[in-house]
Amino acid sequence: MMLAREPKYLSKYLSTLVPRLAIRHRGLWIILLLAFTNNLASTELIEFRKGEHQLFAEVALTASQRSRGLMWRMEMADNMGMLFILEPQSRQCFWMRNTYLPLTIAFLNQDFKIMQLNDMTPLSEELHCSEEPAHFALEVNQGWFAQRDIQVGDHLEATLR
């Protein structure tokens, strides 16, 4: 999965996002701090929880990580995904070029509230755009949210792992 349009003002956005997240999401604050110092490893994970359900997401923060996304992967564990940190001032679009896994994308606001869910077909260049500006996009195996009765309007809890 690839971000079809890269954020142009990511550092400006992150500088305003960090103070807000420091108050609400201590784990994500640490991830953003590491990103500013270029120490973010591709293996850093955020744990998302909704009730008893748990998901671990790799963080795609650099331009390279965002453009590669989940491309070329042939499998992904059921409780894994990828989190994209977005520029929230505009709608964001994703496609499935060179992505072999059927995915569901969740567009999230700054509080990790699910604003929109879209199922995406492997290897398709159809754009899947957020209906409203989103702060994050979370890609998971297709059906992960539906199988757990997690819906638009639900909030996810996030913690650095």
How should each PLM-predicted stretch be described?
Residues 1-23:
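N-terminal secretory signal peptides that target proteins for export/translocation
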Residues 15, 23-24, 66, 78:
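Generic detector of intrinsically disordered, low-complexity, polar/charged segments
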Residues 16, 30-31, 131:
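Short N-terminal alpha-helical targeting/association segments
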Residues 24-37:
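Bacterial N-terminal signal peptides
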Residues 42-161:
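Compact, glycine-rich, soluble single-domain proteins
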